[in-house]
Amino acid sequence: MSYGRYLADYSLYSYCESWCYLFEGTPKLAAIETTSKPSKADTASRRYAYMTSKDGVLYSSYLDGLYFYPYAKKDKSFTVPYETLYVFINDCFYLEELRINATPSHYFDFNILPSNTHLKKVIAEGGKPFETRYWTDGDVLFSRQESTTANPKAVSVAYYPQTKNDKAYRLPDIPEGYYYNIINQFNLNTYIEELYVPARASVWSGMTEKSYRPPNLRAIHLQEGNPMSQSTIDAFTRHGVSIDYNY
């Protein structure tokens, strides 16, 4: 299957991320349509097992799960329906802007392949820094993780566009009581050379490995008090990334 439309039967069952693999090798696929409808009894007992399509995009039957966004769908901007709670966005050839609902009352679980080469921005509509689960700062998407005993106020970089062409990026300052969880969302960006990291942030030690760090990264500037260990500093230095405290 390399082009055209795919007629998905409602009886197929899968989790959303597996759809990415099902449709691999279909770069010309521009829309998905579903055919037969399940009974109300079926959808009540297995609501995530049945699918429907809307504007060429594949969802679970209640639209609460976005399963697959066609590679060749030509819209440059796409707004995730309000009722959609679980989203998986695979690599797309035309999509440049994704809009999600980030109002405080709206639960939302977001997953996007970092290899997406065209998506320039994810706009969290209604999002407020450190108050809602998602918010946008410039063209970078942030996420406040669910509170737990271990991570009461953890914040993450949820999406850093591969297309963002700034040579340096400074993580925004963070309020007292919050902290950035492991920073590791920059590895496929070929522009970034310098990363500025505040004290309340953990840089993932795995970024010392070539495949997990930006290919042109040459310096990480830490704020005084950052908890990066000496062994991690030494590992970065051995791989050509200088570490200093000039945040």
Model segments located where?
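Solvent-exposed loop and capping/linker segments of extracellular ligand-binding repeat ectodomains
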Residues: 1-247
